[in-house]
């Protein structure tokens, strides 16, 4: 079945490449709607309003006043609560006479239990607006709190992605939510995605709906100057893979099924010509600035550029989606044993999200290049590879080698073995990947359980 799907997709791509190249017909995604079709014919872009600028956080009190907010929930984590980003938010709220309550119990890499704790706080508070100050964990938790407090009769699994949850469409009105990201990675301020660990299954899953997108994202690059080295690196790897995966994802008009109602069109729709622009631009910024941002905390140009790149990639993948690196990362993070990442002040073992994503990237892109080799070569070139004499059939190996060098230069752990996994863990890792259909089905190349096992095995060592 997987082989048959690959053959069909490969044939369609060949037809696209051979089609007329005049300006009127050269768009490889152009396709008219066909009544009753099984594959998609449309895509849509949904992003938050974004405001960028140094010290722009000082405007948040005025924003909440303009929204008519009288009782605001501010969410953050215990590492941030005494630091300047949260202080800047609270000072602005006080200055503008906005009443608020502070919730600082967000868990880094949230779980269903930590989500439910925040949801209970939100339900009791009867808030009319939300503010999330932190990384993706904080902003995602804030999205969930807003959703379930606005739909108090819903069961927790109602809105969770299938097959773990029911994946119901969000039809209730939500309260305004302003996101203030303090890391340069998740792009959560731009997306309708909230990710968490479902502890019963030791699997990562999430909620995906345009309805939970933040109303406004305040992109204040000053907040990145205090990020520790490994947090900068791992956050940047998330941007890297968001860009690569969305650019190489299954094209939107090859995705099925086509929804019978636009409300059922998924947030992750497949690569498309608008997301492509954002993904490639973000990738260029990563190539130019990530190493500088990691190595020199005083390099304001690099740190500020990476903060924007996170949002750029968020616009891209928030509509196109991601695929195998992310799908495989969820069990890597969820089955963590004793590994504790440097520069993360947490009370539990942790493989940071960006690290769990990037460790499989050489193996994944070596595997997926068969279906869209030109895009893989283009990505390798952006990351510094010389492709002038490259052959199409070498695309996967070239991108994989380019990624390995990039990761080696940034002192990334030597594969899954370095974060505590052995080949004996592969069956559990594969099992944890299988429920991630929301993202894995966007891989440009179909895959079997055996092939997933092979990718995990190939990722045990990188160098």
From Swiss-Prot:
Keyword Hydrolase: no
EC number(s) stated in the UniProt entry for this protein: 1.1.99.24
Catalysis: reaction(s): (S)-3-hydroxybutanoate + 2-oxoglutarate = (R)-2-hydroxyglutarate + acetoacetate; 4-hydroxybutanoate + 2-oxoglutarate = (R)-2-hydroxyglutarate + succinate semialdehyde
One MF term in the entry's GO annotations: metal ion binding
Name of this protein: Hydroxyacid-oxoacid transhydrogenase, mitochondrial
Gene Ontology cellular component annotations, sorted alphabetically: mitochondrion
Main location: mitochondrion
GO biological process, one term: glutamate catabolic process via 2-hydroxyglutarate
Free-text function comment from the UniProt entry: Catalyzes the cofactor-independent reversible oxidation of gamma-hydroxybutyrate (GHB) to succinic semialdehyde (SSA) coupled to reduction of 2-ketoglutarate (2-KG) to D-2-hydroxyglutarate (D-2-HG). L-3-hydroxybutyrate (L-3-OHB) is also a substrate for HOT when using 2-KG as hydrogen acceptor, resulting in the formation of D-2-HG.
Pfam family, any one: Fe-ADH
Entries under PANTHER family matching the protein: ALCOHOL DEHYDROGENASE (PTHR11496), HYDROXYACID-OXOACID TRANSHYDROGENASE, MITOCHONDRIAL (PTHR11496:SF83)
InterPro entries (alphabetical): ADH_Fe/GldA, ADH_Fe_C, Alcohol_dehydrogenase_Fe, HOT
Gene coding for it: adhfe1
Family: Belongs to the iron-containing alcohol dehydrogenase family. Hydroxyacid-oxoacid transhydrogenase subfamily.
Naturally occurring in which organism (per UniProt): Xenopus tropicalis (Western clawed frog)
Keywords, sorted A to Z: Lipid metabolism, Mitochondrion, Oxidoreductase, Transit peptide
Locations listed in the record: Mitochondrion
Highest taxon of source: Eukaryota
